[in-house]
Amino acid sequence: MVVSNGVATKGVLEAQGVNVYYGSHLAVKDCNISIPERRVVAFIGPSGCGKSTLLRCFNRMNDLVSIARVEGRITYHGSDIYAPSVDPVGLRCSIGMVFQKANPFPKSIYENIAWGAKLNNFQGDMDELVETSLRRAALWDEVKDKLKASGFSLSGGQQQRLCIARAIAVQPEVILMDEPCSALDPISTLKIEGLMHELKEQFTIVIVTHNMQQASRVSDYTAFFNVESVDRGAKVGSLVEYGPTEEIFQNPLKESTRDYVSGRFG
């Protein structure tokens, strides 16, 4: 449950008692978090704290890692996404993902957007879908006259927005972003941040970022993860504190959160 203005609401995505293992190594322990609808939620914390690992559980990308194992319960609109009846590919149509490094397909700009829609048997006007998706990603004006050009011909920032447009085109409800600006210049980063403000009117966004200033600028809620050493030097990540971004940055409840957001470690 998420509490906003004193009112509790059920999250679009919820993790309950989630543990994530890679082989015998516990990477994330006992995570409980609720992601509210049409908000931006930022995951922050030092390297190795499990924020990207948990993010990838939300659309079962960790299924692609043979030694990964998830315990506990993760629900999407109340339904267990790890239930045997759930098709991971179909789930990823509803819960899209944008990765740290832009990864356009080796196709034209147009086909980068249209490809996923075709695979999902889109029956509408493809030209309209491509234009709408590119407009939502704030890229249309820059590429409208070269839609047949390769996606690789774009700058790094444009490629990342192309990947966002590609995710939008399959009409998800949730967009997961794993450090989408880490390889971008400041101007491209600001464009992506502005885009997130616009996209949350229609989409729920969860972003992993090492940039605390970015988290404070773009998110409505912030989750702070930390890492601790356990037996024989192994490290495990966990969720320390979660709440409205203003509270996390200005009046955190936990000392470790205060130390991290003030730059004392990380």
UniProtKB/Swiss-Prot annotation:
Q: In the UniProt record, which is one GO cellular component term?
A: plasma membrane
The principal localisation class reads membrane
Q: Does the keyword Translocase apply?
A: yes
Documented EC number(s)? 7.3.2.1
Signal peptide span: none
Task: Identify the residues that the record assigns to the ABC transporter domain, covering every copy.
Answer: 13-252
Set out the biological process GO terms recorded for this chain's protein.
Answer: phosphate ion transmembrane transport
Keywords tagged on the record: ATP-binding, Cell inner membrane, Cell membrane, Membrane, Nucleotide-binding, Phosphate transport, Translocase, Transport
Q: Which InterPro entries match?
A: AAA+_ATPase, ABC_transporter-like_ATP-bd, ABC_transporter-like_CS, P-loop_NTPase, PstB-like
Keyword Nuclease, does the record have it? no
Q: Which Pfam families match?
A: ABC_tran
Where ATP binds, per the record, is at: 45-52
Q: Where in the cell is it found?
A: Cell inner membrane
A molecular function annotated in GO for this UniProt entry is:
ATP hydrolysis activity
The membrane topology noted for this protein in its Swiss-Prot or TrEMBL record is: Peripheral membrane protein
Q: Which reaction does it catalyse?
A: phosphate(out) + ATP + H2O = ADP + 2 phosphate(in) + H(+)
Q: What are the disulfide bonds?
A: none
How is the subunit organization of this protein annotated in UniProt?
Answer: The complex is composed of two ATP-binding proteins (PstB), two transmembrane proteins (PstC and PstA) and a solute-binding protein (PstS).
Q: What does this protein do?
A: Part of the ABC transporter complex PstSACB involved in phosphate import. Responsible for energy coupling to the transport system.
UniProt record similarity statement = Belongs to the ABC transporter superfamily. Phosphate importer (TC 3.A.1.7) family.
Protein name, per record: Phosphate import ATP-binding protein PstB 2
Taxonomic lineage: Bacteria, Bacillati, Cyanobacteriota, Cyanophyceae, Synechococcales
